[in-house]
Amino acid sequence: TSARLDRLAPEVIRKCRPRLIIGKGGMSSETSEAMKEVGCAYLAFPGGAAVLAAEALPEVLGVHWSDLGMPEAVWHLRAKDLGPLVVAMDSHGRSLFKEVEDSVRKRSVLL
C-alpha cells in the first residue's frame, strides 16, 4: 500500500514534483502538505481490481529505484483507459480518507 513509502513520500514529492500519484490507501498529513506545495493529487485505485489495471497498463517504460524491491520501486508505465480512479487527496490539502475517518470518529462518539 501507499503507507509503506509514506515516510519517504514528502521528500520525493518535493524533489520530483509529480502531478499525480496512484495508490490504494491514504497517506499522511505530511505527504498531503508536500502535495499541496507542488500541486500534486493522489488518485485511489480500488483494491482487488488488478485485472483492470493489467489491461490498462500495456507497457512498462522504465523502472526506477529497483533496489528497493518490486513493490517499492517507481514504475513508469504507459496507461490507456486506466480506471476507475477517485481523487482521494487533492492539491489543495483535502483528503477523502481523513474526511471519512473524521466522520466515523464523530459518529462513534455518539454511540
Which residues are covered by each model-predicted region?
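Long, charged alpha-helical interface segments
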Residues: 74-111
